[in-house]
Each structure stands twice: as C-alpha cells, then as structure tokens.
Amino acid sequence: SSDLDVDRYTVEGIYQQVYLAARELNIEKLPPAAQESWVNSRLQYTHGYGVVMTPAVQGGDEPITWFVRDIPIQSDFGVKVGRPGIYYGEGKYQYVIAPNEIGEIDHPQGNTNVMTDYTGGGGVPLDSILRKILFAVYFGDRNIFFTTKTTSESRIIFRQNFVEAIQIITPFFLLENDPYIVTTSDGLFWIQDAYTLSNYYPYSQPYDTDISERMFGDLNFNYIRNSVKIVVDAYNGDIRYYISNPADPIVQAYRRIYPGLLKDMEEMPQELRKHVRYPKQYFTVQMSMFSRYHQVNPILFYQEEDDWEFIEMNYGPLLPYYLTLNLLNPQKQEFILVSPMSPTGRDNLRSLVIAGCDEENYGKIFVYSFPKGEQIFGPAQIIALINQDTAIAQELTLWDQAGSRVIFGKMIVLPIGNSILYVQPIYLESAYRLKIPELRRIIVSQGDLVVMDRTLED
C-alpha cells in the first residue's frame, strides 16, 4: 500500500503529468494465519513490488490507460522500472531476514509465486552467533537466534521506513510531509524534501497561520529554507543528501560539522534530477506570508486593503497543486506548482501564483494578479454556477437517484491565454459494487459559461 504521487515523465516522446503509486508490502493485509507465522512474516514476505502509473489526463467513460501495470510489471509505453523490489518505503514495517534458505516471495504468477533472494546491502549481516544473540535481545524475539533458515549471506533488515531513518540520522532537518517515488532504469528511488529552520532571524515575522499548525504542529520559526533533497534507494536503503540551496548558511554549517554527508546537487544522477520539484509545504508557507507582504504601498499594507487568502472550498482551503502546462514558455510543457488566491473574506479570484519545478525555472515565482476592481469568478462562485445550471443539475440528480453517489473532485484553475478556465471533475461511486470512484464527466467553466462533457477535449 502507498499513497498516490504526482510527477512528470516523458512517455513515448511526450512530456506529461502522471500519477503513480508504489506497491509497498502491507503485512496487515495478509490472512491472519500468515501474519501469525514467523516464517511468513519474517522470511518470505519481505518486500513490496514495483509501481503502477497512469497519465493524469483521462477521459470519462473510457478504459483507464496504464503506463505501468500488472504483476509482473508490464509497460506498453516503454516506461522503465529497474529492480522493482521495495524493501524501504513509507509504510509500517517489521524486521525481516533476507536472503534465507526458504526464499522470499517476489510476486505471484499464475497459481504459483516467483521467489527471489535479496542481493542488496541494506540491513546488518547475521553472520555470527554474537550478532544473532544481540538482535534476538534487541527485538525480544528468540526466533532470530534459534532459526536454522539463515545463511552466511543473510542480513537482518530493519528501520525500513525511510522517513523514520532520516529523522534518526539527521534530526535537525524538518521533512516535507509528502515524499514521492521515482522509477528509473536503475531502480526505484524515494525523493524527500528537507528544510532548515530558525526562530532567530532578525526582524522577521514568525510563521503562525490557520494552516501552520496542521502542517508543522507546534514548531515555531521565522526562517525556513528548502535546502536539502534526500534520495533513498528503495532496494538498498542507501540515503543520500544533496544541497539544493547552497546560499543557506545553516546547511553550510551542517556541511562543515558533518563532512561528507551533504553532496552538491550536481552529483545527483541526472535521471533523478529530472524529477526534483518545488515542494508544496514550502510554497504554502511562502504564499501564507506573501498574501500580506505583496503590498508594497505602506498605507495599503497597514490598512490591509489588499490582503489575500487561500480560496475556501467545501473541503477546506484550496492549497497549491501541481500542473503540467506551457504557461511559462508557450513552446514547452513545464511542471509547475499553482496557488490561486482570493481577497480576504471574498470569493472572487485575485491572483494566480506559480512556482517553477523544472530545472530551467526551478524556484522562480511568477505572480499573475488581476486588477482589484475586476471581478473574476472564483471556484466557490463557479460551483454556484454549476448548481444553477438546470441541465447539469438534472443529470447529476438522475445519477444520485440511480444508486450512485456523485463526487465533486478537486477543482483545477487553469490560466488559458488572457482568461481563466475552471475544470471540475465529476466522479461516480457505486452504492453496490466495489466503491472505487469512476471519472464520468468534466465540467468546464469560463466566465459565466458552464459546459459538461465526457472529456476535456470534447
């Protein structure tokens, strides 16, 4: 099991946004008898397997396109997944011993299981009686000492949750709450953004907003930099730290304290650098502060005449989200982070702020603001227009009455030329079958025009 990650890949020569998820091992989903078996849970079910990937743009009423699918892994689109074993991930893990005499279950195939033997360098070798005794005491499990199924190559693999491992190794870095997996020809890798913090930056306002507690708990700071990108090998568990902001004095101090720990960004393999992105939490902090400090006129600033806020939706604030558009360069699709903003206490759209994620524009912030007197409909007003459209409302009501639940997906705000396009996906969830929401319609709005169809192209 794993959460859904958003990224961009070049698939069949087309640069496009995708959704992908790692197939991590979830021992709790095994039958109870298998969970209770020490051999099953410690020697055989040792790792997850591969990823699934779909394009972000899919049409309603059409079969799902899979860039990467199935077990064993298949890709009809040439997407490479090297070494698919996932021994290190985001989930809850317990120690395992690999390789071993029984063999590890890699993946099912037909009515049998394909077996494998771990060849990585993760964990600690169990190559002596002393080590077996020490680990048996450490984990409170005598089976580690008494088992006869280990070999001279066996390793005990623990702390597979790489987030916890990073926090143990470098507790002075704050970690982004949404690491993501990347598939390459060399294997699967996790990318984790990390921050340096301080509460002692002179003449700087502390970060304290309605959203801050949800993202950072009770942390107090008035300085934050996304100075480190961390790469974790999902097979070996190798953790590599790369400095993404060399101008940060705090990260340079850590570099001097721990020589060899922090590498230059240029040392990151190019196949991974293509997937580095501007982090959401960092951009959310910036937008929370910029929503007031964009006002350069002192009178307007103190009167708070043009304060902004995140747009409020029925599910909460509309926080920054990733898109792939040719907005920054008409000749080229780019992966960007978008944050629509509204005037404080009002529903209309006031600005679109965009952060570049690709190398050429990485970290550059672009602000598209609309004149204060111009009323540009915001997402909440678009929802009201949708509800007022009799044809759309009638069709949605029919679906509801037919035993399906209509679900409004997350609205997307797209700048197109000199206008704003709103895209509202509509999902149906069956009340009788497996409750997986299915994309059925796309509602598009521009100005006061609202249209519903099966796909965005229609």
Model-predicted regions and their roles:
Residues S2-D458:
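Soluble extracytoplasmic regions of secretory-pathway and membrane proteins
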